[in-house]
Amino acid sequence: MLLCQISDLHIKSRGENAYRVVDTAESLRRCVAHIGSLPTAPDAIVITGDLVEGGHADEYALLRELLAPLPLPVYVIPGNHDERSAMRQAFADQPWMAQGGERIEYVIDAHPLRIVALDTVIPRRGGGQLAAESMAWLDATLAQAPATPTVVIMHHPPFATGIGHMDQIGLANGEILEPVIARHPQVERVLCGHLHRSIQKRFGGSIASTCPSPAHQVQLDLRTGAPQLFVMEPPGYQLHLWTPDGGLVSHTVAIGDFDGPYPFD
């Protein structure tokens, strides 16, 4: 199975740029076209939060329009820029959206790789938090299929990254997730967003990772007190290839017009 992950789209109202600089709609158009041109088509896409910038209905409508050229299942979770009720309405035609209660949490059993979605959002806050009820649900859900390879998807990564201003709006209680993941070795990866960069950490006997944005990236500055900046580094997304013999292998894909490809001989 080939699973595509995109994250932190930050779609604005039609014709508006994010932070007055970033044409996020055009960025997503290029990303969708790039995914559509892959020599091997993904089997599904997960979008790990911050689908839109302001949580408005018209932003979600534009998002659905931009994703429409992709003829494959798309599964989404909220980020801190999303608004749950507007997001539910925008994806009301998707059966998985009806699984959760207050939070947008669900499980997908339609693929060789099981997908379990967690909601880390605190409304109107940049940082996130895991609910005790979510941890109980996750533990029980993972226990139902101990032999099925699984990815857990969530917006805020459950670890500090060293990028101070992002860690300040990180996951407040990520440590409560680690023993749950450790109890279920079928979890191949915890796939996250929020950081607008590709970052990995060993976590609960598995790997937790973040995905770059198809739009703008967070400036990599590990100094204490570094300013809050973004940079127009090459946009990207990730491909996660699952095979029974090889397990889960992840690739970060850059979006752009680059020279080549050239033969090695």
Where are these regions (language model features)?
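Active-site environment of divalent metal-dependent phosphoester hydrolases
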Residues: 11-15, 53-58, 80-88, 123-126, ...
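N-terminal active-site segment of His-dependent metallophosphoesterases
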Residues: 1-62
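Extended active-site neighborhood of metal-dependent phosphoesterases/phosphodiesterases
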Residues: 57-144, 176, 182-186, 212, ...
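Active-site-proximal beta-strand elements of phosphoester/diester hydrolases
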Residues: 1-13, 112-122, 151-153, 206-212, ...
